[in-house]
């Protein structure tokens, strides 16, 4: 009986961590899309704000993600960092392109 309890507790823990990854992934995607929108509008400060929020969530998702989605999340995190760096230099076009790349990776991680 004890073994069954431990197995069920372990299964619940495994299932709950993937739910947390999905929540962070959804938030990262939302903020990355906002960053792209602000980039198209030409607003580097707002773009940087959303890119930083997306990066925070993508890093949190990466901690609990596994396998191929984790690779996409890590690539998205790298692109988001590039977007932040470029927007801090007021290079909106390059920052927008990096944010768009991050969105592509985040969407691929959901599949």
Predicted feature locations:
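Long, charged/polar, soluble alpha-helical segments
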Residues: 2, 13, 17-111
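Bacterial N-terminal signal peptides that target proteins for export
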Residues: 1-7
């Amino acid at each position: 009986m004890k073994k069954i309890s431990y197995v069920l507790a372990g299964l619940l823990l495994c299932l709950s961590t993937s739910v947390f990854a999905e929540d962070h992934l959804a938030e990262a995607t939302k903020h990355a899309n906002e960053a792209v929108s602000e980039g198209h509008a030409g607003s580097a400060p707002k773009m940087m704000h959303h890119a930083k929020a997306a990066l925070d969530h993508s890093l949190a998702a990466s901690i609990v993600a596994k396998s191929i989605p984790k690779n996409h999340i890590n690539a998205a995190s790298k692109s988001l960092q590039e977007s932040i760096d470029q927007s801090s230099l007021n290079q909106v076009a390059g920052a927008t392109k990096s944010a768009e790349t991050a969105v592509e990776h985040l969407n691929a991680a959901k599949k």
